[in-house]
Swiss-Prot record:
It catalyses: O-phospho-L-tyrosyl-[protein] + H2O = L-tyrosyl-[protein] + phosphate; O-phospho-L-seryl-[protein] + H2O = L-seryl-[protein] + phosphate; O-phospho-L-threonyl-[protein] + H2O = L-threonyl-[protein] + phosphate. Expressed in flowers, seedlings, roots, leaves, and seeds. Present in stomata and meristematic cells. Has a dual specificity toward Ser/Thr and Tyr-containing proteins. Prevents biotic and abiotic stress responses, including ozone, oxidative stress and pathogen attacks; represses MAPK activities during hypersensitive response to limit the spread of the HR response after infection by necrotrophic pathogen such as Botrytis cinerea. May be also involved in ABA and salt responses. Dephosphorylates MPK3 and MPK6. It comes from Arabidopsis thaliana. It is found in: Nucleus; Cytoplasm. Pfam families: DSPc. This is Dual specificity protein phosphatase 1B. InterPro entries: Dual-sp_phosphatase_cat-dom, Prot-tyrosine_phosphatase-like, Tyr_Pase_dom, TYR_PHOSPHATASE_DUAL_dom. The lineage of its organism: Eukaryota, Viridiplantae, Streptophyta, Embryophyta, Tracheophyta.
Amino acid sequence: MEKVVDLFGVGEANSQKLLEGGKDLSEIQQGLFIGSVAEANNKDFLKSSNITHVLTVAVALAPPYPDDFVYKVIEVVDRSETDLTVYFDECYSFIDQAIQSGGGVLVHCFMGMSRSVTIVVAYLMKKHGMGFSKAMELVRSRRHQAYPNPGFISQLQQFEKSIQGNA
């Protein structure tokens, strides 16, 4: 195997672990999982978890198994000024179609803490008519490391207002 360089700014050893695959999936509801790039790189674990679709919310992470899973990639960075709201509808559709087809969907970013959590919280809010606090509480109860950045939290709070306005 080639030497792993510190591409992700987490040290060579941690970069190696992330690329080899992890097993820290959090099932938020039936068929909907949050994880990190480590889980996205663990083909056998994804298959054993009935994952059929993978939604990547990160830059520079090409789908590792395009012949085995249906992928959607949203290339965004984890910064407060990044506008994730423009992707909420297409992510909602991707997640919902995966679940409706009887499969499972992994939503992941790099660490499974901010971008992926934001997308899943937005999905829950729209799908189940949940408020931001209730959806965030549900996600955190199943994934303790769920901490969207302050900009994403603000976007989710605004999204809640827009959903309530359409009700």
